[in-house]
Amino acid sequence: MAWNTNLRWRLPLLCLVLEVAMVVLFGLFVRYSPDADSSWSNEKRKGNITSDLENEFYYRYPSFQDVHVMVFLGFGFLMTFLQRYGYCALGFNFLLAALGVQWALLMQGWFQYTKDRLILLGIKNLIDADSCVASVCVAFGAVLGKVSPVQMLLMTFFQVALFSANEFLLLHVLEVKDAGGSITIHIFGAYFGLTVTWILYRHNLDHSRERQSSVYHSNLFAMIGTLFLWIYWPSFNSAMSNYGDAQHRAAINTYCSLAASVLTSVAMSSVLHKKGKLDMVHIQNATLAGGVGVGTAAEMMLMPYGALIVGFICGAVSTLGFVYLTPFLESRLRIQDTCGIHNLHGIPGLIGAIVGAVTAAYASPDGDRGFVYPFGFHNEKDEKVQGRFQAFGLLLTLAIAMVGGTIMGLILKLPFWGQAMDEDCFDDSIYWEMHEEKSSSPEDHTHKPSVPTEPVEQPTSSATLAP
């Protein structure tokens, strides 16, 4: 029996209930931070601040802009590679991100920014919320084309809450250093999403196989997303670092790692094709792996050549993953990873976590290696202990992501969320009104063309993200 995909009441009701809840909760718990409040002039006098330029807004807003572009444009366009799923990729990414940032401001605020039971909202909160939603976008890539917007909203709501708890445990309880989010953002999002898609395994997804391929223009749109992400990733990894050398170093390390991953992924893509041709899937994704891999160690004394090595390894491993690992995961482990997030976020995230742990463990007192003494820690932890804490943070994140993904997958598996049948997946027309091209004149509707119409465009590449 076919499932009912008509969302006329379910989607509007869920959206309105969630937004009304946000309004009430913001009214009860959220206020402006001192830097954003009208009392800023009093704060200046108390702190002997001579210029408004010392307001944190002017330090953080450029980074916030870049991260915002990555979340709403970069991730959205990156997922438009499917030939008949562009509306859903962009539109649903927009929807879940809009819900996610509001819920993240509350959840992260309750965990990190409360004062007298109130959340004081400033530019740092906005960056943190966008970073949280980036993890949601990562998980979305695993289930792209196979879930309804109602399921995505529920998944976003649950994941943001779990992300905030995990982030608090790692960054504030264990004091794990993770400037670019290799652990808290990429590993958490990837393995949460992979676990959800494993639970939601579709036995007859082959019936939608044709729509899982790309065409020329869909690959171009996806490449736009890649370029947005690639350009702004240094800001993403350095946005929340301390002012000065730490933030400067994070941008440099990310810049170098990204550049190295481009050359490596191009080389590997050509080598792995029997005719030496490049696969657009690899170029869209593996070229970004360096940004993921250097995330944890971004603000550490990794050294530029170390960042290049990380990018080199991540680009190669990511490309190999698309060729060999994605088919294996689907055929043997029943993990249908639409966007190949395991290759772009999962494995490079694991590499980044290991690099961070090793770099921390071999830090030096004068700060010429690692970061322990330059950054400082409570409880007088030495570099070896910090390295072990970094490793434990990785294991804890994997456990929380997989357990949470299992719970969420079982909830989403219920048959009344408006999900499509297997043969209808990866098709915009299930949830969007499709406006076909019509004649410009109403009188021309009976006119038949005197010349043959153009043939339907066929996919130019047989490569997909989930063979």
UniProtKB/Swiss-Prot annotation:
Record PTM: N-glycosylated.
Membrane topology, from the record: Multi-pass membrane protein
Residue positions the entry lists as glycosylated: N48
UniProt keywords, alphabetically: Ammonia transport, Cell membrane, Glycoprotein, Membrane, Transmembrane, Transmembrane helix, Transport
Chief location bin: membrane
Record-level GO BP terms: ammonium homeostasis; ammonium transmembrane transport
Basic and acidic residues bias (residue ranges): 436-447
Chain ranges on the Extracellular side, renumbered to this chain: 31-61, 108-131, 174-179, 241-251, 304, 365-391
Residue numbers on the Cytoplasmic membrane side: 1-9, 83-86, 201-219, 273-282, 326-343, 413-467
SUPFAM superfamilies: Ammonium transporter
Catalytic activity: NH4(+)(in) = NH4(+)(out); methylamine(out) = methylamine(in); CO2(out) = CO2(in)
GO molecular function, one term: ammonium channel activity
Start and end residues of each stretch annotated as Disordered: 436-467
Compartments where located: Cell membrane; Apical cell membrane
Function: Ammonium transporter involved in the maintenance of acid-base homeostasis. Transports ammonium and its related derivative methylammonium across the plasma membrane of epithelial cells likely contributing to renal transepithelial ammonia transport and ammonia metabolism. Postulated to primarily mediate an electroneutral bidirectional transport of NH3 ammonia species according to a mechanism that implies interaction of an NH4(+) ion with acidic residues of the pore entry followed by dissociation of NH4(+) into NH3 and H(+).
Subunit structure: Homotrimer.
Official protein name in the record: Ammonium transporter Rh type C
Organism: Oryctolagus cuniculus (Rabbit)
Phylogenetic placement of the source organism: Eukaryota, Metazoa, Chordata, Craniata, Vertebrata
